Amino acid sequence: MASTSTSTQPSGWRHTASQYAALTKPRVTQLAVFCAVIGMFLATPGMVPWPVLIGGAVGIWLFAGAAFAINCLVERKIDAMMRRTAWRPSASGELGARQILLFSLVLGGAGMWTLHVFANDLTMWLTFATFIGYAIIYTLLLKPATPQNIVIGGLSGAMPPALGWAAVANSVPAEAWILVLIIFTWTPPHFWALALYRRADYAKSGLPMLPITHGEKFTLLHILLYTLIMVAATILPFVHGMSGYLYLAVALVLGFGFLVHAWRMYRNYSDALAQKTFRYSIVYLSLLFAALLIDHYFKFGPQGAAL
């Protein structure tokens, strides 16, 4: 009996740990931290100091996890209605409200301390403001109130490059805000593609998502329009002198691919196309920022002295 108890205990701990980890929405957090790290490298012509790189990334990850945990806490009843999110420990009841709140407070507190020690106070307070923007303003106020929630609230999700930049430079210049603008304009077509092929789920939730309140064709038109705006925004790093021809070529090719996805959906919508567009949007952003990083260090073509 003793051996059986010993052998099953670790799996119990692993399960609990995985439940808490799920609250942080790991895939979304990874993309946010990736964009923050790119912002760190773009803020300096040389190497980012290791303490700042690691400490800044960890601090931003902790804050992001705290914000997503609060989101799961606030939306636990809504998540329970939706097939896509019903498995979350907050929705299933495997973790209670007090546990989730305490977990979020611990992550947020640890994030503040980490950024204060390894980065700077500007980064700490900007990240805290981003936390408030997502966990409170977006989740509590905007998301249940307006179908434009993802547009207005998208700023908090677009902040990671500026946070990374601030961690290295202790400032947030125009170059950092260009990166924020790219993600800000990327967010609506990315999210609305998901909302389209998951609209049955969102209809159950009662949240005023654009496909529910304004219909499929209206949403598809807005995806197409925002994709055009996003492609224009991605050219700004080249225009501003942050990048060279390699980035410009990658941005144009990737942007053309995004436009093709958006146009195909608009002309002949299917859930399969929406799902492909959603997945492409994640690859798109990752490759776009990777191209920025490569061009930053290898100098493919004329770059200004913006830094």
Swiss-Prot record:
Its main location: membrane. It comes from the Bacteria. One of its GO terms (cellular component) is plasma membrane. It is found in: Cell inner membrane. Disulfide bonds: none annotated. It holds the Pfam family UbiA. Its EC number is 2.5.1.141. Keywords: Cell inner membrane, Cell membrane, Heme biosynthesis, Membrane, Transferase, Transmembrane, Transmembrane helix. The chain crosses the membrane at residues 28-48, 50-70, 100-120, 122-142, 149-169, 176-196, 218-238, 243-263, 282-302. It is a multi-pass membrane protein. It is an enzyme of class 2 (transferase). One of its GO terms (biological process) is heme O biosynthetic process. Converts heme B (protoheme IX) to heme O by substitution of the vinyl group on carbon 2 of heme B porphyrin ring with a hydroxyethyl farnesyl side group. Belongs to the UbiA prenyltransferase family. Protoheme IX farnesyltransferase subfamily. This is Protoheme IX farnesyltransferase. It comes from Ralstonia nicotianae (strain ATCC BAA-1114 / GMI1000).
